[in-house]
């Protein structure tokens, strides 16, 4: 569980540390707001409300399933600044499929914690392999990191792309290429 009081105290200390008047009307309730926000954006640190990636057994579909351009946000664990973008998730079933909303739900759960994009990408692919036992999967995540956009090197709009490739997507260049072409295809 989250310790809301400890979060509020910490935020108050940070505000004092940067020279803010913690009793100023616009700032006074900020520690409470931040504590509530942390409970929401870090929900993935708690056990999931439901079983992730509930599968439907006995399906005979054995061709690629791809959901692309799934928007997400997360928080970089190094600077506690957001990173956000789109995920693309492909898998080839082996007797099990999931309802299409299950993949974005899994992404949302795993992204709601202090995180790095590389780990998020791998965690999603590993979860897919563990729960669905598909012939293979591929996860590609494209994201902008505010820790690069608004501080440090200050390069807004720079995108970081990570991938995790498992099973047949790793073994077969043709399968991997098909997924990449579908991900990169833009409807006119």
UniProtKB/Swiss-Prot annotation:
Reactions accelerated catalytically: GTP + H2O = 7,8-dihydroneopterin 3'-triphosphate + formate + H(+)
Gene Ontology molecular function terms on file: GTP binding; GTP cyclohydrolase I activity; zinc ion binding
Subunit record text: Homomer.
GO cellular component: cytoplasm
Family named by the database record: Belongs to the GTP cyclohydrolase I family.
Pfam family, one: GTP_cyclohydroI
The gene coding this protein: folE
Source species: Thermodesulfovibrio yellowstonii (strain ATCC 51303 / DSM 11347 / YP87)
Name of protein: GTP cyclohydrolase 1
GO BP: any one term: tetrahydrofolate biosynthetic process
Keywords, ordered alphabetically: GTP-binding, Hydrolase, Metal-binding, Nucleotide-binding, One-carbon metabolism, Zinc
Positions bound to Zn(2+): 76, 79, 147
EC number: 3.5.4.16
Pathway of action: Cofactor biosynthesis; 7,8-dihydroneopterin triphosphate biosynthesis; 7,8-dihydroneopterin triphosphate from GTP: step 1/1
